[in-house]
Regions:
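Acidic/His- and Gly-rich active-site-bordering loop/insert found
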Residues: 32-150
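His/Asp/Glu-rich mid-to-C-terminal helical/loop segments that flank catalytic regions of hydrolases
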Residues: 210-211, 279-300, 329-334, 380-390, ...
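A conserved active-site cap/scaffold subdomain adjacent to cofactor or substrate pockets
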Residues: 314-395, 399
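Zn-dependent metallopeptidase/amidohydrolase metal-coordination segment
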Residues: 46-54, 401, 408-423, 428, ...
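Fold-level recognition of mixed alpha/beta catalytic cores in primary-metabolism enzymes, strongest
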Residues: 184-283, 287, 291, 295-296
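N-terminal mitochondrial targeting presequence
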Residues: 1-34
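A short beta-alpha structural unit
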Residues: 59-63, 311-314, 324, 360-376, ...
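Active-site metal-coordination/substrate-binding segment of hydrolases
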Residues: 107-209, 214-216, 238, 379-382, ...
Length: 552
């Protein structure tokens, strides 16, 4: 591309997309932030909602594509916004960004407070929704459900996780220091992290020195239950188990065989941390059980496993799975298999049916010419694979003694796939105690060892242990209870938050609290935010900051 065409392209590019910092002199001369175009349907959805500035920031942010790992345009919008307010920003090599706002009023000489949220969002859509998350804006809608007022999206994730936290931080940065009657604010260090949703990668690579972070109190705005304060979270890590297999074309001899699919579907699935204590069914494990039962019912040499697959995300309980088996082409063999699957389905309904009302386990004949050319696993390989799946820990392993009802340690058997020479199983383990997490991962290693396989484990990210002497907890609890008129909930969450990693990066002496407005259905097209909780949430943030502004 010629220099002229590059310049022409740059001239046509909106300011919020330009990479690199615009000079302070340009803004001093009267330059104005050029925000992204907010779709008319989104404007209609947020009309009249308070606080208006926060909703405007959220709508603008939602008009900029920001999938995990591709947050550049949103980050550039934040930079341009900061410069339009004559605020300084710094970034590190990972793309994390910090914007600095001086304190106002009596808070001018107070210690800085870090306001933190992540910029990226989960990108999920309904199968009948035409939406490109790399280019299209989120289209919002306003509706009433269960007598509550909600803002959601039209067939996609909304991005309130964590767009609400980012919008709140931008609203704080944008408060006019000369506003009459405004609450005093301490110096604010607004930290915007990247690539949170795919494994906390931005927080893991955060460079506190490059970002100029000095605050020793942090408000994480990435929780979704208004009225509760969160003081701890689980750490976690993935284990990729690989089990060698052998395929044998002659396992069924010279007999004619047909193909059958054993399929499990209709399960609820859900988050592998937040929902793990509910006892939801795991599609992979139910499929392993049903397949094992089917092979045993057929009898030696009369059925063999060809393939198995299920699950697609490390942090989701598998909703469905299927196995393909080769079966001798006799009516008696097929009937024995179908009867065994009916019995397995009945047993599963007895175990899970009150919760998993959509659960289905079925066996049906299929015709797939490609699969006829796939040699089945030999009997030993199939037995080792299915036995290993059923031996792996799944669900809550231990509950907390300190916070009754809170899962302390868990494991999720997240996915399985069978290739030519090996089967791969992904597990996601969590614990708020580091040693318990590693003990769980060691159990996974032991199962893999007994199956003749190996394990590659990701570096575990740390949990966040509750601090009973937390000053920010005392202040937040008092102020929240004054606002609510009743006792505030103090909780920990069995899921990964950036807080654990950020404490490691910013120093163990940092004091942290996490909270947010009410958001339901996060990570799905059902995601929605209770609009009536947004104003009190933002006012509460200001209450905390006003209190800290007086702490010299």
């Amino acid at each position: 591309m010629s220099m002229l065409s590059r310049q022409a392209l740059r001239a046509l590019t909106p300011a919020w997309l330009l990479v690199g910092r615009t000079s302070a002199a340009a803004f001093a001369a009267g330059a104005v932030l050029q925000a992204p175009t907010i779709p008319a349907v989104t404007r209609d959805a947020i009309e009249g909602l308070e606080p208006a500035a926060l909703w405007e920031h959220f709508a603008a942010l939602s008009s900029i594509p920001r999938p995990s790992g591709r947050e550049e345009a949103a980050l550039n919008f934040i930079k341009r916004f900061a410069e339009s307010k004559n605020l300084v920003w710094k970034e590190d090599d990972a793309g994390n960004l910090c914007v600095f706002r001086p304190g106002t009023g009596v808070g001018g000489s107070a210690s800085p407070v870090i306001i933190q949220g992540h910029v990226d969002m989960v990108t999920e859509k309904n199968s009948d929704t035409a939406h490109d998350f790399n280019s299209d804006p989120i289209l919002m809608r306003r509706f009433v459900k269960d007598d509550r007022n909600w803002i959601g999206a039209q067939g996609t994730t909304l991005g309130a996780d964590n767009g609400m936290g980012v919008a709140a931080a931008l609203s704080l940065l944008g408060i006019d220091p000369n506003e009459e009657g405004g609450k005093p604010l301490p110096p604010i260090q607004a930290l915007f992290t990247v690539d949170e949703e795919t494994g906390l990668h931005g927080a893991a690579k955060l460079d506190a020195e490059a970002l100029g972070l000095t605050g020793k109190t942090m408000l994480n705005l990435d929780m979704e239950e208004w009225g509760d304060l969160f003081v701890g979270c689980a750490g976690g890590g993935d284990s990729n188990v690989e089990i060698p297999i052998k395929r044998n074309i002659s396992i069924l001899g010279e007999e004619v065989f047909d193909l059958m699919e054993v399929r499990v579907d209709g399960l609820m699935g859900g988050h592998s941390g937040l929902n793990i204590a509910e006892g939801r069914g795991n599609g992979v494990l139910l499929c392993a059980t049903a397949t094992k039962v089917a092979l045993e019912a057929a009898g030696p040499g009369k059925a063999a496993l060809i393939s198995m697959s299920g699950g697609d995300k490390h942090n989701a309980i598998p909703r469905e799975a299927s196995a393909i088996i080769a079966v001798l082409s006799t009516a008696a063999t097929k009937e024995r298999i179908k009867n065994s699957i009916r019995a397995a389905a009945s047993a599963a309904v007895d175990e899970f049916g009150l919760l998993e009302k959509g659960l289905r386990i079925q066996a049906k004949e299929i015709d797939d010419s490609d699969l006829y050319d796939s040699p089945p696993l030999d009997e030993e390989s199939a037995t080792r694979l299915l036995s290993s799946l059923l031996a792996l820990p799944h669900g809550p392993i231990k509950f907390s003694h300190a916070l009754p009802g809170l899962v302390e340690t868990s494991n999720n058997v997240a996915s399985v796939s069978v290739g030519v020479g090996s089967a791969k199983v992904l597990c996601s383990s969590r614990s708020s105690i580091g040693s318990a997490l590693e003990n769980t991962r060691d159990r996974i290693k032991a199962v893999a060892f007994l199956a003749g396989g190996n394990v590659a484990q990701s570096k575990a990210y740390p949990g966040w242990a509750p601090n009973p002497r937390s000053c920010i907890l005392d202040v937040s609890k008092r102020l929240l209870e004054e606002r609510l008129g009743h006792e505030a909930g103090v909780k920990a969450v069995h899921a990964g938050l950036e807080c654990g990693l950020l404490i490691k990066k910013l120093g163990e002496d940092i004091d942290v609290i996490s909270f947010g407005p009410t958001i339901e259905g996060a990570h799905s097209p059902d995601e929605r935010v209770d609009s009536n909780t947004v104003a009190p949430f933002f006012e509460f943030v200001q209450d905390i900051l006003a209190d800290y502004a007086t702490r010299i």
